[in-house]
């Protein structure tokens, strides 16, 4: 069982449930475009942690924990997979990728964002070589990005199961405090 298969088996439903809880705090309903924008924010946070040793310090939070930021990326990708109807029966095929971790998150994230904009009528439609439909491209990019994020955590010697669990607990508490 590879990293993506393990993550899907152990954490995918928890991620979807957590994102559903956040609906209580939303002023507007989130769709695939909104989730994609949040995914871009979280990928930026990974770059902040890895490339800027200072981190970002905001009132009440610091962006300096790679495990938490990777977990945030996985959370957004998990919810995006739910919104886009992605299934993971082929997760075993996503064990390696030609891109390095940061390169892959950036390039594939750009391709995913473009495809979601195209699907939603914000960009012109064009044929995608190697894919039967825009949905096939979206599904592929989500799975590849999840596998790359998990690989990044492994290379950093992180226990992403633990990190993801901590992030989910913290986020659940965040929602509970604000909806009490």
Language-model features and meaning:
Residues 1-180:
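Flexible "arm" and connector segments at domain edges
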């Amino acid at each position: 069982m590879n990293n993506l298969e393990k993550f899907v088996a152990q954490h995918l439903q928890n991620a979807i449930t957590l994102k559903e809880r956040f609906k209580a705090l939303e002023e507007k309903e989130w769709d695939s475009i909104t989730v994609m924008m949040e995914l871009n924010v979280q990928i930026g946070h990974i770059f902040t942690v890895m490339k800027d040793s200072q981190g970002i310090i905001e009132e009440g939070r610091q962006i300096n924990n790679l495990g938490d930021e990777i977990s945030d990326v996985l959370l957004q990708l998990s919810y995006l997979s739910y919104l886009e109807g992605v299934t993971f029966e082929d997760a075993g095929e996503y064990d390696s990728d030609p891109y390095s971790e940061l390169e892959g998150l950036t390039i594939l994230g750009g391709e995913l964002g473009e495809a979601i904009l195209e699907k939603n009528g914000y960009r012109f439609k064009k044929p995608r070589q190697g894919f039967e439909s825009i949905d096939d491209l979206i599904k592929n990019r989500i799975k590849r990005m999840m596998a790359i994020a998990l690989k990044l955590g492994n290379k950093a010697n992180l226990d992403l199961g633990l990190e993801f669990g901590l992030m989910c607990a913290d986020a659940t508490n965040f929602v509970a405090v604000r909806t009490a």
